[in-house]
Regions:
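Long, distal/terminal scaffolding or interaction modules
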Residues: 313-314, 325, 338-342, 351-354, ...
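A structural-propensity feature for long, helix-poor, extended segments
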Residues: 89-127, 133, 299-301, 305-334, ...
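Generic recognition of stable, solvent-exposed alpha-helical segments in well-folded globular domains
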Residues: 2, 17, 42, 49, ...
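Short acidic (Asp/Glu) and glycine-rich catalytic loops that position anionic groups and cofactors
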Residues: 1-2, 43-49, 149-153, 178-179, ...
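Generic secondary-structure signature for well-ordered alpha-helical cores
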Residues: 9-13, 70, 74, 104, ...
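Hydrophobic alpha-helical scaffolding
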Residues: 12, 33, 37, 51-59, ...
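Conserved, well-structured core domains of diverse proteins
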Residues: 1-144, 321-332, 336-450, 458-462
Length: 658
């Protein structure tokens, strides 16, 4: 405690650097005994560690933070790199699972293992940017968790490619509430001018929690320009979001969390007074497990074993669970002392009570109008409901789930259901997949256990996060986000009324898919198979940006494609049937190359393509694929294979070693 008081003094008595430093606490209540203040265990529930992925930090650091937070009853955050399934259900499990733009490691089991699912729209330290995990940090374990190959640089896009509007965000929130109806869904925003309007939209999109992330967070791998100049203090964003939600009568529907440089109990109390109910710590927690701010997180050379995957450097890791537990215990103890001094029994009582703050008497402070930040609106200051329930309760699938539960519990006898479907029925098979994942994890059910034959135009996110053992046959058409995050099973879309040149699927299909098969007897929209890392698919045409950021899986396109093919693609392969002879011009050559495969050295690839087309014809009856198979020796000359640069000698070397 004496050591912590030294830290408190250094932080709380520092030069006026942050907005919160220009306010003192005041209260019109008499102090109370500390015994009357809520216990440490209640305060711990409001604490979490900020998102840091397995990959950005070492396995030892990641597991230490998770174990510590589970020990005290707080929450740790997995970050965006997936998590080892061996940790699920143990003290090493991260309660918060993050869904970021790269969708790395996002599987049905991953999503079901959480009590909170966090959609990371942006990071406070580098707002508006994506991310990269250098190939040097992609070890065999990291590659396995992220469904890619060791040594390959992994790129997270700047935006979520299934979120271009607040309605799109609402759809992703709905998807996540279907796969895990017991988890809160949080949306991480950065502190910026106008974040209040965004926060109101997020609440209307039925998020349960909003995170306001400040610019003072760590993110040791962020560009130096972003660290110095991008983002706003969390205080400004928190005040704006809190008041905008109150002004729109939405504050009672959502919880607000903040992060970005929180270090002491005084920081927590001031954050509560400004409107936050929960608090995340990143840099402080990392320092406790050994971080000494070398700022080489992106180089894999962290000398203390915290932010590296190098086995020799990881042996230098000295962090332990007890240090982290002690830190959060001391923070919570300081919070209790401040609450007792102010005359309040809980953090809940002071959330949003900005009358407990007064501007300091300081000449420098008088140059700014800090009083303006303390304006007050009437209404709820805290969340009043356990979940921000959507109007759509997905009764359609819940009724189907009742029919399927006996088979899910005892999959020895397969079941076939025939149903009508409409575009009102969103995220079809996602709720079913969640129940399968809860019982069997990613192993799912045996192939073909559940067959769902549906007629009509499906809603968005057909088969999102789908588990193994489910086959969906659609007689009609799909919509946007077909097979988003699917892990297994098969989706086949055909239409009696439409031919190969008709669109039977929308935009961003197979986004972040980790397995399974998608056959569409028609065209699909833009950003097809973006961040695909394991699914196999055949379609008959796409829009722009196909196979973007792809890291695994196989895509076969039997028709026209749009421009920017394979941008950011670092794994997997695509076969493209180029009848018009202009495909080569559409390839983004930065990371990939287009190769002809009509020679003997590519016989393995030709065999793979032929086998896929045979299965596709059997499932869809495609005339175009049938023509190719019947004339394979000549039609193979019209195919290009797109793969990461250098794949040709690699394949040749593999065959030589067989």
């Amino acid at each position: 405690w004496e050591d912590y008081k030294d830290v408190m003094h250094l932080v709380n008595k520092r030069d006026k650097k942050f907005i919160r430093d220009f306010y003192n606490l005041k209260s019109d209540r008499a102090s109370i005994k500390i015994d009357e203040v809520e216990p440490l265990s209640e305060i711990f529930k409001r604490f979490s560690t900020a998102a840091m992925s397995m990959g950005s930090i070492s396995q030892e650091a990641h597991e230490t933070l998770a174990t510590a937070m589970n020990t005290i009853g707080g929450k740790s955050n997995s970050g965006e790199g997936g998590e080892d399934p061996a940790r699920y259900g143990t003290e090493k499990n991260s309660s918060i699972k993050q869904v970021a733009s790269g969708r790395f490691g996002v599987t049905p089991e991953y999503l079901r293992s959480a009590t909170e699912l966090q959609i990371k729209v942006a990071q406070g330290a580098k707002p508006g940017e994506g991310g990269q995990l250098p190939g040097s940090k992609v070890s065999p374990l990291i590659a396995e968790l992220r469904f890619t190959k060791p040594g390959v640089t992994l790129i997270s896009p700047p935006p979520h490619h299934d979120i271009y509007s607040i309605e799109d965000l609402a759809q992703l929130i709905f998807d996540l509430k279907q796969i895990n109806p017991n988890a809160r869904v949080a949306v991480k925003l950065v502190s910026t001018a106008g974040v209040g309007t965004i926060a109101a939209g997020v609440a209307k999109a039925y998020a349960d929690k909003i995170i306001i992330s400040g610019a003072d967070g760590g993110t040791g791998a962020a560009p130096i320009g972003s660290i110095r100049f991008a983002g706003n203090p969390w205080e400004l964003g928190l005040i704006e979001a809190h008041n905008a939600l109150k002004a729109n009568n939405l504050r009672g529907q959502v919880t607000i969390e903040t992060d970005g440089g929180l270090k002491t109990g005084l920081d927590v109390v001031k954050a509560a007074i400004l409107g936050a109910e929960e608090y995340a710590f990143g840099t402080g927690a990392l320092v406790l497990v050994g971080c000494i701010m070398l700022r080489v997180c992106h180089l894999n050379t962290c000398g203390v074993g915290v932010a590296t995957q190098d086995e020799h450097l990881r042996k230098r890791f000295t962090g332990n669970v007890q240090k982290v537990v002690n830190y959060f215990t001391l923070i919570a103890t300081e919070v209790r002392e401040i609450l007792a001094e102010l005359g309040y029994k809980s953090l809940e009582e002071i959330v949003g009570k900005n009358e407990l703050l007064e501007v300091i008497d300081d000449e420098f402070a008088k140059k700014f109008n800090f009083e303006e930040l303390l304006y007050k609106l009437e209404g709820d200051n805290t969340c009043q409901v356990p979940f921000n329930e959507p109007y759509d309760q997905n009764e359609y699938e819940q009724e189907i789930l009742k029919e399927l539960m006996p088979t899910i519990k005892d999959p020895s006898t397969p079941i076939v259901l025939n149903k009508e479907i409409s575009n009102l029925n969103r995220s079809f098979a996602t709720r079913i997949s969640g129940e399968i994942a809860a019982l069997y994890g990613n192993a799912g059910l045996p192939d073909g256990t559940i067959t769902l034959n549906v007629k009509g135009i499906t809603g968005q996110s057909l088969g999102a996060f789908m588990s193994k053992g489910i086959n969906i046959n659609v007689g009609g058409a799909g919509n946007d986000y077909i097979g988003k995050g699917m892990n297994g099973g098969q989706i086949v879309i055909t239409s009696d009324k439409a031919g190969s040149d008709f669109a039977l699927g929308g935009n961003t299909c197979l986004y972040g898919a980790t397995g399974g098969t998608l056959y569409v007897h028609g065209q699909v929209g833009e950003r097809f198979a973006v961040r695909n890392s394991g699914a196999t698919t055949v379609v008959e045409g796409t829009g722009d940006h196909p196979c973007e950021y792809m890291t695994g899986g196989v895509a076969v396109i039997l028709g026209k494609t749009g421009v920017n093919f394979g941008a950011g693609m670092t794994g997997g392969k695509a076969f493209v049937y180029d009848v018009e002879g202009n495909f080569y011009e559409k390839v983004n050559p930065e990371l990939v190359e287009a190769l002809r495969i009509d020679t003997d050295e590519w016989d393995t690839e030709m065999f793979e393509l032929k086998a896929l087309l045979k299965d596709y014809v059997a499932k869809t009856g495609s005339k175009r694929a049938t023509h190719i198979l019947e004339n394979f020796r000549t039609e193979i000359r019209k195919f290009w294979m797109v793969a990461p640069r250098g794949v040709k000698p690699t394949i040749a070397a593999d065959k030589k070693g067989e």
